[in-house]
């Protein structure tokens, strides 16, 4: 004979800790979201205001199943039941031994019918291949209950499905591309992949905030209670369950991170983030590659990307499963109507969220627009209007100046600055972009004096570009007060010096002539929508 209890506080649940964990250990559970530590930590932080009710099914006084639910009463006095952790738990299921799963589910649903008469079940995160999902559907069919199911794909790597060599071979093009990013970044400084203790979690949240500051983020990952949740979760780790945070650091500065929930043979990737200033170097791909190989070396069988249709989740996968949203109601008119409305809403939502281009438009472009409207100053508005106008019609006239080679040794030496030297500067995003394009920076102390490129001359406003001769350097963003010293500094290497000045900057052109430059060419660029024409006039 089966019986049940309703647990409404953590104190009431504590005596069942060993039974709960024992069932999961016996069933070799690898779903981190139903581990006792995850559930109780969520309840104590994020779910403190929810009406949590954990239904325990007992057989002869021994707990054989746990249903971790949130119970509310809504319109028409209909009772709503859903799994706890909604919005934070990707997967959820009933905690029960396989032999008791069917009986426990059938029993508790009959209890709902007798006790509440009219109810609506909304169970999210059901793993399609697991027993909970199958038994719920079986019950609905057997008792002819109105129900609907929505599926979302879940991609993962099964390291036992192929050898590491075969995996590397299958993705050799992707690995080759990542290696190029890694090699290029290492040219600028030291790169380090390392695990992180809870005392450094604040850096993870700071980086995530920077990553999403211009996007629409609904994850609530950086909210105060969510931070507290993950910090507490990291402190309750055990042999079966633990939180791992890894960072990719460039010269001691975080440029990407991963936070994983590890449960027995499964490594679930909870969240990733990277420094937007380093987008050109692919920091997200770099740390994902390192994290996957680490998971394999640590003995995990599964590397789980979670549910969703984001393209990056299908870059590496070997297998897929599905997570279900299961909606079932009793047969009354009101609850059937509400269920039908929920089904319609979820179908529309599914069509929209499965369209990745539409998701990007809303998340990225709309996010950038809202960020701009909130933070833009007069200068940014003027720059925007100028940019819009120049996309339609624009005329640019620029003058090219050259200072010929000299071997004068009376120069003022400037120190070459490396990427690590500019990591704390406000202009870091622009400087990193210039480093990536092959520019070099020179300065006096911590003050940047000029930027130099030895292969290409580039004018940012007009987009004009041309290749330099073998013994010529292009300088830009120079300190006009030190222009003579800059020229001598470059010329001492036996190189000519090239720069560009727009026609309306008379003072700069005079400074260039005083420093030994002479104008060699005038370029006029005309743009009308996508049509573009260059006119060259030799001097």
What is each stretch, according to the model?
Residues 92, 117-125, 465, 470-475, ...:
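Hydrophobic beta-strand segments of well-ordered beta-sheets in folded domains
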């Amino acid at each position: 004979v089966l019986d049940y209890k309703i647990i409404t506080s953590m104190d009431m649940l504590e005596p069942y800790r060993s039974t709960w964990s024992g069932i999961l250990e016996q069933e070799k559970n690898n779903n981190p979201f139903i581990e006792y530590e995850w559930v109780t930590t969520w309840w104590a932080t994020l779910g403190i205001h929810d009406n949590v009710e954990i239904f325990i099914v007992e057989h002869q006084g021994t707990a054989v199943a746990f249903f971790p639910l949130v119970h509310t009463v809504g319109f028409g006095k209909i009772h709503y039941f859903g799994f706890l952790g909604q919005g934070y738990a990707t997967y959820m299921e009933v905690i029960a031994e396989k032999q008791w799963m069917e009986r426990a589910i059938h029993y508790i649903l009959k209890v709902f019918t007798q006790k509440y008469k009219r109810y609506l079940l909304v169970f999210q995160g059901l793993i399609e291949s697991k027993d909970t999902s199958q038994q719920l559907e079986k019950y609905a069919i057997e008792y002819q209950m109105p129900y609907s199911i929505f599926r979302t794909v879940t991609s993962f790597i099964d390291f036992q499905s192929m050898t590491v060599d075969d995996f590397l071979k299958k993705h050799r093009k992707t690995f080759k591309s990542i290696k190029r990013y890694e090699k290029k970044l290492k040219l600028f400084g030291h790169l380090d992949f390392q695990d992180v203790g809870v005392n450094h979690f604040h850096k993870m949240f700071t980086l995530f905030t920077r990553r999403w500051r211009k996007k629409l983020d609904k994850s609530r990952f950086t909210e105060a209670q969510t931070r507290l949740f993950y910090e507490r979760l990291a402190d309750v780790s055990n042999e079966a369950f633990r939180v791992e945070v890894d960072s990719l650091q460039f010269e001691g500065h975080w440029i990407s991170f991963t936070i994983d929930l590890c449960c027995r043979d499964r490594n679930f990737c909870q969240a990733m983030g990277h420094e937007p200033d380093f987008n050109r170097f692919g920091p997200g791909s770099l740390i994902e590659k390192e994290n996957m190989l680490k998971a394999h070396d640590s003995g995990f069988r599964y590397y789980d990307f979670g549910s969703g249709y984001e393209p990056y989740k299908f870059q590496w996968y070997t297998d897929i499963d599905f997570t279900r949203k299961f909606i079932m109601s009793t047969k009354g008119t009101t609850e059937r109507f509400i269920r039908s409305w929920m089904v319609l809403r979820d179908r529309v939502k599914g069509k929209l969220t499965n369209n990745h281009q539409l998701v990007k438009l809303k998340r990225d472009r709309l996010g950038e627009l809202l960020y701009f409207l909130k933070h833009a100053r007069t200068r940014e508005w003027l720059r925007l209007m100028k940019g819009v106008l120049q996309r339609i019609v624009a005329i640019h006239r620029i003058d090219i100046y050259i200072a010929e080679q000299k071997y004068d040794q009376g120069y003022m030496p400037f120190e070459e600055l490396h990427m690590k030297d500019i990591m704390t500067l406000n202009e870091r995003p622009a400087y990193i972009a210039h480093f990536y394009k092959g520019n070099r920076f020179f300065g006096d102390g911590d003050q940047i004096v000029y930027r130099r490129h030895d292969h290409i001359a580039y004018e940012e406003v007009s987009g004009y570009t041309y290749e330099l001769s073998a013994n010529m350097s292009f300088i830009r963003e120079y300190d006009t007060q030190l222009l003579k010293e800059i020229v001598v500094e470059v010329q001492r290497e036996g190189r000519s010096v090239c720069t560009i000045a727009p026609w309306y900057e008379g003072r700069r052109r005079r400074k260039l002539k005083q420093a030994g430059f002479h104008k060699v060419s005038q370029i006029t660029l005309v743009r009308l929508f996508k049509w573009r024409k260059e006119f060259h006039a030799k001097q």
